């Protein structure tokens, strides 16, 4: 029973690959016409708009300094000094620095971790 199932699976796979090649070769030889979209006029007015540049960069995106990064604790980390800069996670001190120097994307409050506080 297993061998019959394997044999049928192999035959089906060969059939699928051979039929794809027939369609591809027929399309390349212009034997098949490309399908036209009937509703193309309906969507002509809905052309995509140019994406506006964001005021801040998400984690992993390019940045020039800490003020370019969105999150309060995000810092602009650069390789080899000033090359290949991207926003990465910082800490509480990063947030305080950004609060002091940034005019745009200025943090309103800095989150403090509860891990280091002593209880009792």
Swiss-Prot record:
Residues 1-16 form the signal peptide. Keywords: Disulfide bond, Knottin, Secreted, Signal, Toxin. Residues 56-95 form the Agouti domain. Contains 6 disulfide bonds. It is found in: Secreted. The keyword Disulfide bond applies. Disulfide bonds join 56-70, 63-76, 69-87, 78-85. The keyword Disulfide bond applies. Expressed by the venom gland. GO terms for cellular component: extracellular region. GO terms for molecular function: toxin activity. Residues 17-54 form a propeptide. Its main location: secreted. Belongs to the neurotoxin 05 (agouti) family. The presence of a 'disulfide through disulfide kOR' structurally defines this protein as a knottin. This is U13-lycotoxin-Ls1a. It comes from Lycosa singoriensis (Wolf spider).
């Amino acid at each position: 029973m297993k061998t019959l199932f394997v044999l049928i699976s192999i035959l089906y796979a060969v059939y699928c690959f051979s039929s794809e090649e027939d369609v591809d070769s027929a399309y390349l030889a212009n034997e098949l016409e490309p399908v036209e979209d009937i509703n193309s006029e309906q969507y002509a007015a809905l052309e995509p708009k140019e994406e506006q540049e964001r005021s801040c960069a998400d984690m992993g995106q390019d940045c020039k300094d800490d003020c370019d990064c969105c999150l309060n604790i995000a810092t602009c980390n650069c390789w080899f000094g000033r090359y290949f800069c991207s926003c990465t996670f910082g800490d509480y001190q990063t947030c305080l620095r950004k609060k002091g120097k940034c005019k745009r994307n200025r943090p309103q409050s800095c989150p403090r971790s509860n891990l280091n506080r002593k209880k009792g």
